[in-house]
């Protein structure tokens, strides 16, 4: 059974089994880095199955949504709290920012809320992680371009 989170009253889309729904770019980069490091150390690509590929496509989709080129995207987060670093203003979407193809993140890797949504180190981490996905999928699936991730 799924444990009910202490954060179940957060004003976001909470589901059973989710502890907390704060989202940071690095949270999606680490599974990629782990996959890539494992593959480089072992040469074993058997772990890159359909479930792994589905997860990678979801990561790419999330990064694209959070570029916010076509609106705010589906993610928002609010919490009733006295701590400013624990919540996100303006309906849970954060302060306005001009879209520029960087990925928005309302939280830093420390779980503290951001004021400015474009965390350059986190975006660099994402670029590196996306390059690792490309290298793996070119090797395993013979993917040649970005269109393969849209299927």
Segment roles from a protein language model:
Residues 61-81, 115-119, 125-151:
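Catalytic cores of carbohydrate-active enzymes
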Residues 2-22, 83-118:
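Acidic/His metal-coordination segments adjacent to aromatic residues that form catalytic metal sites
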Residues 1-85:
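Aromatic-rich carbohydrate-recognition surfaces in CAZymes
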């Amino acid at each position: 059974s799924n444990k009910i989170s202490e954060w179940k009253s957060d004003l976001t889309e909470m589901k059973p089994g989710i502890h907390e729904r704060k989202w940071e770019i690095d949270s999606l980069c680490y599974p990629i880095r782990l996959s890539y490091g494992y593959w480089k150390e072992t040469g074993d690509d058997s772990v890159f199955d359909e479930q792994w590929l589905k997860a990678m496509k979801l990561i790419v989709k999330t990064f694209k949504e959070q570029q916010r080129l076509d609106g705010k995207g589906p993610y928002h987060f609010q919490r009733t709290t006295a701590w400013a670093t624990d919540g996100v203003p303006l309906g849970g979407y954060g302060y306005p920012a001009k879209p520029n193809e960087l990925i928005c993140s309302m939280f830093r890797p420390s779980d503290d809320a951001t004021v400015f949504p474009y965390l350059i180190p986190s975006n660099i981490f994402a670029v590196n992680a996306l390059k690792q996905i490309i290298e793996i999928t070119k090797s395993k699936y013979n993917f040649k371009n970005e269109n393969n991730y849209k299927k």
